[in-house]
C-alpha cells in the first residue's frame, strides 16, 4: 500500500481519487499535483513505481500544507478569532453557525440536540 505524508492510499483507486484521501487535497489540487509531476491520473495506486512515489512525496512536502500542519493552522485561526473577539470568534465560542446561516430553524448539527423548554400552562 502506497503511503504519502502519513496516509495510506487505497491500492485500487485511480491516482486522481486516491490523492484526495489526504486532508487538504481535493479533486482539483489532485489533478494539479499529477500534472506537475507528470503522472497519469488514470494510473492505479498499485501500479506506481517507487520513483513516482518519491517524486509525488517530494512535490507535496515542498509545495503544499496538508494533514497535521493544515489541521493545526485551521485550529490556530479559529483560536485567534476567538481571542480577538470578532463576530466569527463569538459564533465559534457559542457553538453556532459561523457563516451567516439561519438559526431560528435548522442548524441542529452545530447547536446540538434540542433543549425542550417548558411552555406556558393553558388557562381554563
From Swiss-Prot:
GO cellular component: cytosol; plasma membrane; small ribosomal subunit
InterPro entries assigned: Rbsml_uS13_C, Ribosomal_uS13, Ribosomal_uS13-like_H2TH, Ribosomal_uS13_bac-type, Ribosomal_uS13_CS
GO MF annotation terms: rRNA binding; structural constituent of ribosome; tRNA binding
Region of interest (Disordered), ranges: 94-124
GO BP: any one term: translation
Pfam families (alphabetical): Ribosomal_S13
Keyword set includes tRNA processing: no
SUPFAM superfamilies referenced in this protein's UniProt entry, alphabetically: S13-like H2TH domain
Keywords: Ribonucleoprotein, Ribosomal protein, RNA-binding, rRNA-binding, tRNA-binding
Protein's UniProt keywords contain rRNA-binding: yes
Domain of life of the native organism: Bacteria
Similarity remark: Belongs to the universal ribosomal protein uS13 family.
Function according to Swiss-Prot or TrEMBL: Located at the top of the head of the 30S subunit, it contacts several helices of the 16S rRNA. In the 70S ribosome it contacts the 23S rRNA (bridge B1a) and protein L5 of the 50S subunit (bridge B1b), connecting the 2 subunits; these bridges are implicated in subunit movement. Contacts the tRNAs in the A and P-sites.
Complexes and interactors: Part of the 30S ribosomal subunit. Forms a loose heterodimer with protein S19. Forms two bridges to the 50S subunit in the 70S ribosome.
UniProt-recorded name of the protein: Small ribosomal subunit protein uS13
Organism this protein belongs to: Mycobacterium tuberculosis (strain ATCC 25618 / H37Rv)
